[in-house]
Amino acid sequence: MDSKRKNQELSTSETADPSLSKTNKKQKIDMQEAMKNQNEVSLLLVGKVISAVAKNSNCVFSPASINAVLTVTAANTDNKTLRSFILSFLKSSSTEETNAIFHELASVVFKDGSETGGPKIAAVNGVWMEQSLSCNPDWEDLFLNFFKASFAKVDFRHKAEEVRLDVNTWASRHTNDLIKEILPRGSVTSLTNWIYGNALYFKGAWEKAFDKSMTRDKPFHLLNGKSVSVPFMRSYEKQFIEAYDGFKVLRLPYRQGRDDTNREFSMYLYLPDKKGELDNLLERITSNPGFLDSHIPEYRVDVGDFRIPKFKIEFGFEASSVFNDFELNVSLHQKALIEIDEEGTEAAAATTVVVVTGSCLWEPKKKIDFVADHPFLFLIREDKTGTLLFAGQIFDPSELSSALDRA
């Protein structure tokens, strides 16, 4: 995001439905500070999710999808405790502020760019409400016109399983059939009152594609001392790489659309120098605000040995162990999938909240090696806003998943 946009202050009346406010006062929102806070929350989520449900295993999830579904939930609940918890977790002072961030991301980051040669992006929201409950007319208007969400009144009391299957079909349809079952059996019951859902799909081509004829099977070293043979993409092209104390960072830009002047998407790989040091690197990254922005490779450099593995992983989890203060009869489910190959990246995530009753031109000449043959962290990020679309880690690229039963 350019400096003018980042420093622009948006009034609540420009970004949110006025029905959300109890007063007619226009609350000025510093979008730069609000976005900074939400990006810090996303980074905290990376650390929380990995430490709670993906220790030393493959994972992928979407912080952006979780933030979106929490925003919709907070804006449309009478449960003051739930709203207060979400706002505290998102480091936000009001639903007006979270809605303003949602509006900014929807109009800039999550706009589909495939027709002009950029990434294909789809970000959709859905709300399912128990039909016997009364609904504030302002909420329904907010769902449909502000959040652009599909909205349905359903019979949880007698047809909970049918609703669960409908939500799963909705998630599958909006993630290009990548996410088949966001809600596992038993997650929706006759006590369910609301389901808030968000589905995010991303498919981007590398700015410089890899030559498939150069891909070779090589060993990837596991933590247990063994290794697996997996296909590695190789290149002799200059790459955005920077070496730091104990680790290296690779930035792989995605091809931009012709009108993508306000956004830039990249994948980042964070590779520790030693194979057993990923946990320590993750701690450094997630405990230091501003770490990502201060560790971005700025120049393409000549490469020596350059190899990154192809991989496809799927990961699902229920977030009660992540939100350990979330004792509010609410469960949050997410499932995500990502595939990396010579052409680019395809990734998708679906998240649901289930609410139940009760609640310069210089560049160095020295060649740099980047051999991702041991565990590493990856992020997909929109660089101008700092938005984290997807995050994860690879411990064994030969495995499709090791945690699908956690959803």
Curated annotation (Swiss-Prot):
Composition bias type Polar residues, residue spans: 9-22
Swiss-Prot/TrEMBL domain comment: The reactive center loop (RCL) extends out from the body of the protein and directs binding to the target protease. The protease cleaves the serpin at the reactive site within the RCL, establishing a covalent linkage between the carboxyl group of the serpin reactive site and the serine hydroxyl of the protease. The resulting inactive serpin-protease complex is highly stable.
Keywords recorded for this protein, A-Z: Protease inhibitor, Serine protease inhibitor
Zinc listed as a keyword: no
Protein name as annotated: Serpin-Z2
Site annotation Reactive bond: residues: 358-359
CDD domains registered for this protein in UniProt: serpinP_plants
Family label: Belongs to the serpin family.
Domain of life: Eukaryota
Organism: Arabidopsis thaliana (Mouse-ear cress)
PANTHER family: SERINE PROTEASE INHIBITOR (SERPIN) FAMILY PROTEIN-RELATED, SERINE PROTEASE INHIBITOR, SERPIN
Keyword Repeat: no
Coiled coil: none
Function: Probable serine protease inhibitor.
Cellular component GO terms, alphabetical: extracellular space; nucleus
GO molecular function: serine-type endopeptidase inhibitor activity
A Gene Ontology BP annotation from the UniProt entry: DNA damage response
Region (Disordered): 1-28
Residue ranges of the region described as RCL: 344-368
